[in-house]
């Protein structure tokens, strides 16, 4: 596994990686690297206005992006009780976070994943990852490493060859502060 992690560390510095999530393969990069984020958006043919999701091994990896102090104490349990798990939350964004991640909004989409391969990857890298489905906009997302290779070829710098979590649908997306549902899991 050490060789695998070494390859992941090398690829994430400037590149795009693919890894399994709860339902589909995700494409990701270091959210602190704007060049890599722009490359990812270009590869996916995804408009920057849509924003991106960040996944993490634990909530502390999301603190550089989430304005934690803006989450009221009476909402804190509601927010944190969703994780780890297959729920992406829309939370207040910390000042200075790239608009490429937020789509220009004052919120950011984040998830503490329970899917162990993705969680182990975030743990090993020591930070959150951008996470967007591994597909060209408008096409079906890849569900295997082979499908990622088929859709993207050499455009992806490293692929984690593990299984998805087997969920039928992508994660639910909600704003727990106002109970707005952006994507249901049904």
Language-model regions, residue ranges each:
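Active-site-adjacent structural elements in enzyme catalytic cores
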Residues: 1-186
């Amino acid at each position: 596994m050490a060789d695998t992690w070494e390859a992941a560390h090398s690829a994430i510095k400037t590149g795009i990686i693919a890894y399994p999530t709860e339902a589909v393969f995700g494409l990701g990069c270091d959210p602190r690297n704007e060049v890599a984020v722009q490359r990812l958006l270009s590869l996916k043919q995804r408009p920057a206005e849509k924003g991106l999701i960040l996944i993490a091994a634990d909530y502390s990896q999301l603190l550089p992006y989430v304005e934690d102090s803006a989450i009221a104490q009476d909402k804190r349990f509601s927010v944190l009780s969703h994780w780890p798990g297959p729920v992406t939350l829309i939370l207040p964004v910390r000042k200075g976070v790239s608009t490429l991640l937020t789509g220009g909004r004052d919120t950011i989409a984040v998830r503490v994943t329970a899917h162990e391969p993705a969680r182990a990857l975030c743990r090993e890298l020591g930070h959150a990852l951008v996470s967007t489905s591994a597909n060209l906009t408008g096409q079906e997302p890849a569900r295997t490493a082979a499908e990622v290779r088929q859709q993207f070829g050499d455009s992806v710098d490293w692929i984690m060859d593990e299984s998805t979590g087997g969920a039928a649908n992508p994660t639910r997306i909600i704003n727990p502060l106002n109970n707005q549902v952006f994507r249901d899991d049904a």
